[in-house]
UniProtKB/Swiss-Prot annotation:
Belongs to the radical SAM superfamily. RlmN family. GO terms for cellular component: cytoplasm. Residues 126-369 form the Radical SAM core domain. It comes from Nitrobacter hamburgensis (strain DSM 10229 / NCIMB 13809 / X14). This is Dual-specificity RNA methyltransferase RlmN. Keywords: 4Fe-4S, Cytoplasm, Disulfide bond, Iron, Iron-sulfur, Metal-binding, Methyltransferase, rRNA processing, S-adenosyl-L-methionine, Transferase, tRNA processing.
Amino acid sequence: MAVGDAPLEKVALETYVPPAKPSLIGLSRAEISERLAAIGVAPAQRRMRVQQLWHWMYVRGAKTVGEMTNVSKDMRAELEKHVTVDRPEVVAEQISNDGTRKWLLRLPSGNTLEKPHEVECVYIPETDRGTLCVSSQVGCTLNCSFCHTGTQRLVRNLTAGEIVGQIMVARDRLNDWADRETPHGNRLVTNIVMMGMGEPLYNFDAVRDALLIVADNEGIGISKRRITLSTSGVVPNIVRTGEEIGVMLAISLHAVRDELRNELVPLNRKYPIAELMQACRDYPAASNAKRITFEYVMLKGVNDSLDDAKLLVKLLKGIHAKINLIPFNPWPGTRYECSDWEQIEKFSEYVFNAGYSSPVRTPRGRDILAACGQLKSETEKLSARERQALRAMAMTD
């Protein structure tokens, strides 16, 4: 199929079917109150009960209703008949040589006729922070040609509970809840990036609801300035992101000419660069203190020339921006190569001298296929030959 004929977006194969006993994870306070009303909790008690449940779920990380010891025994028994506080199940964990962790998570579902679906979630520890890369879809709506996830079919959108559940799983695995000890007394998951599997702005409502729960000061409590949502450029929902969520914004740009971006990010044929840049200028939360990050994967001989760097600087005029240069992370079957390090440095230096911060992202988790652009759920397993190719790539980098 020619590049110009490739579909801009994939259609989801399925819709979400909840388990017989749904989880309270991902519900708003109002929705939890409705669940309590449905099982007969008196109106005068609901507000207090909601706060108790919220605290146990998002501050103390309770895995069962039975752990909630300040909720009456009778109330716990009634709740356990109807709801859970389940999160996704960890079915595999890989730990990279650099400390990066990747979890393969199986999603609970009420659809017993289908194979359970899985997504990947990645934890990246650094000296001053711990970043969790979270998925928003099973597969991805888009067909970005340099991205491994883009080769996977779109199965369905994740629910708010499945998105929040990834953060809760990470805190479970790292023992990172408020009443538990962590090294040096610091929280281990300090930053969230919506840069995992999927296009977040094609699952706007669930992503919004999940991130508002994550940022809630009476629960998980991660500041909106430490949450970054990355989009390939779903222009109509960019301003909504600033107005309704208010988190940091990242744009997967990767090219400065429409002709090339049409190939790398086919969504560009629907929302071309000029429209995308205007949406960024209109982004409500942008300021010099809250700059928009432009992600730019460095592809050898494709988008890494100094002419590209010059055009990038022109495009960013009038936008509070920083540029994150990403060395291409190889995956089996890709036709792209990473730019030479010398060329990456030249590109970065030009952009920096033009007045924009332009750090080069350190690749993390390449050896476990956890780096940027490498995620692909185990529902589409790599063959033995592909795994051998991956190991060879990691050894040569």
